[in-house]
Structures are given as C-alpha cells and as structure tokens.
C-alpha cells in the first residue's frame, strides 16, 4: 500500500519542523554544542525508534562531522564503553529520556548530574534536538521513506 508522504501532503507543517530543527542547530552552535553531538542524539533516537531513513541519514552525517565507525557501531551500548565524553553521555541520556519518556523519566538526581556537564542552554537545546528528531522519525516511519542502495 502506498503511504501518504506527510512532507508533501502537509508541506507547510513539515516546513515548520524543518525550520525548528534549523533553529535548534543554530542555537546549539551558539551554545557550544558541536554538530557531532547533535548527530549523536539524532542517531541514537533513530536507533531506538527504528527509523531506517533517519539511521541512514544521520550515520552519514555523523561520519561527515568527524566521528568514527567504531563509535557509531557501539552507540546502542554507549554506557558500556569509555568512547564517549561526559558531554556526549549527558546528551545521550537526554536523547533516551525524551524518546522513552513513558518509561524512563530522568529523576532529579539524574537531571542534576546532567547539569554538571551541560549549561542550561545546552540542556534545553539537546532536549529540543531530541524532540525534533523524534518527530522526524515518526514522519519518516509513517510515510515509509525509502532507503535506497548507494552506488
């Protein structure tokens, strides 16, 4: 069955999401968050949600941002490695808390630990980043965006 391409059917709504994501990226840069940290969030959320289109897109973006195949490969088990910085670990905690919000709220102690490694602006922007990629995952999955073989 052919799915409704939500990005085209409701183009103005989709454009608003794109604009929101662009604003998050711009403000994140101002707040000292690298594109690589944002892409880690994008990739981890996409792994959890099982969005093939976004996994393909954000694994490439992470490599382009200078990350390694090794770190991408172990990202689902990031807690079991020493390959991620404290800032990245805090970002990944936020990504997972937002994505699994019905199951895994950050308690006050966990939230306090995040703030040892992130500024208020960074916490806010990483949360917005996780919110926006969760929305994009859902659009991509519901629309069944294809992943085409690379040549």
Task: Identify the function of each model-found stretch.
Residues 1-151:
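Hydrophobic alpha-helical segments
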């Amino acid at each position: 069955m052919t799915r409704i391409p939500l990005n085209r059917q409701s183009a103005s709504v989709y454009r608003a999401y794109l604009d929101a994501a662009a604003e998050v990226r711009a403000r994140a840069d101002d707040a000292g968050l690298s594109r690589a940290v944002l892409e880690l969030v994008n990739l981890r959320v996409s792994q959890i949600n099982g969005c093939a289109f976004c996994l393909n897109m954000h694994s490439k973006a992470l490599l382009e941002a200078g990350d390694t195949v090794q770190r991408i490969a172990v990202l689902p088990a990031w807690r079991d490695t020493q390959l991620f910085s404290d800032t990245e670990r805090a970002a990944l905690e936020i990504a997972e808390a937002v994505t699994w919000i019905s199951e895994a709220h950050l308690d006050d102690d966990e939230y306090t630990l995040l703030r040892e490694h992130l500024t208020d602006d960074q916490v806010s922007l990483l949360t917005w980043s996780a919110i926006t990629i969760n929305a994009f995952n859902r659009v991509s999955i519901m629309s069944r965006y294809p992943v085409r073989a690379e040549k």
